[in-house]
Amino acid sequence: PPSADGIVWEQLWEDFDEIYADTDAYPFIETVNAGVYDEDNFIRFYLLLNTTISGEEAAEYATEVIKGFNDLIWEQNHDYARSTEDSYGGYVSRYNIYVMVGPDDVKDNRETWILEDTIPAGEYRPVSPGGEEETSAES
């Protein structure tokens, strides 16, 4: 049954995993995990790899995953806007976004992570390999 926000979470997590942990589409991915944490207003994404990819590839994949997560919610509840080129979409934009991309086999060692980024609620910028420091240089 749908939750108070009109979302069948069990279905959403199944679809999310089926799409973004598909090794035919994304041969580098080992597992995708995400969680919505209302208590501190975060959605956290943990994208674990079976091989090394570049920071740019990791950032593009992470941006795609975040938008895709929102759009899976949009498919269930059109009250939330779909993602666009310059928005993560209506559901995700209400939350701070945390994302990390790193190798699964050494995920506990933060130094091995390819990317770690936090994007404040309501703000849009693509995920960046250098986190928020890198984006201010672009103008």
Where are these regions (language model features)?
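Generic detector of well-ordered alpha-helical segments enriched in charged/polar residues
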Residues: 10-17, 59, 63
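Sec/Tat-exported extracytoplasmic proteins
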Residues: 16, 20-27, 36, 65-73, ...
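Short edge beta-strands and adjacent turn/loop segments
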Residues: 20-52
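Polar/charged, Gly/Pro-rich intrinsically disordered segments
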Residues: 22, 78-139
